[in-house]
Amino acid sequence: MEEYYFVKNFESLFEELSQKIAERPEGSGTVEAFDKGIHHLGKKIIEEAGEVWIAAEYQSDEELAEEMSQLLYWLQVMAHKRGLKLEDIYSYL
């Protein structure tokens, strides 16, 4: 019997974050970071961008992919904080 695993993509993560921010589950790190504001989120993005660079220079592809996923996560939280939709971002790709 084949097993299927749900793989998140950019759109599903954005929707998951939308739901989490709207529902505000107790103990959510996402909600806590969201509430701390733009400055806090900006620092997280800078931190993750640095970790992506270091991983690209010195670590495995798996570690690089993990760091890149974390950067994308924080970029999406920032987008939500500013009220951006995916269409706003996609219009510049």
Swiss-Prot record:
**Organism (species):** Corynebacterium aurimucosum (strain ATCC 700975 / DSM 44827 / CIP 107346 / CN-1)
> What NCBIfam families is this protein classified in?
histidine_hisI, PRK00400.1-1
**Catalytic class of the enzyme:** hydrolase
Pathway where this protein functions: Amino-acid biosynthesis; L-histidine biosynthesis; L-histidine from 5-phospho-alpha-D-ribose 1-diphosphate: step 2/9
* Keywords carried by this UniProt record: Amino-acid biosynthesis, ATP-binding, Cytoplasm, Histidine biosynthesis, Hydrolase, Nucleotide-binding
Does the keyword section mention Hydrolase?
A: yes
Cysteine-cysteine disulfides:
none
Entry protein name: Phosphoribosyl-ATP pyrophosphatase
Name of the gene this protein is made from: hisE
Quote the EC number. Answer: 3.6.1.31
Q: What's any GO biological process attached to this entry? A: L-histidine biosynthetic process
Any one Gene Ontology molecular-function term assigned to this protein's record? phosphoribosyl-ATP diphosphatase activity
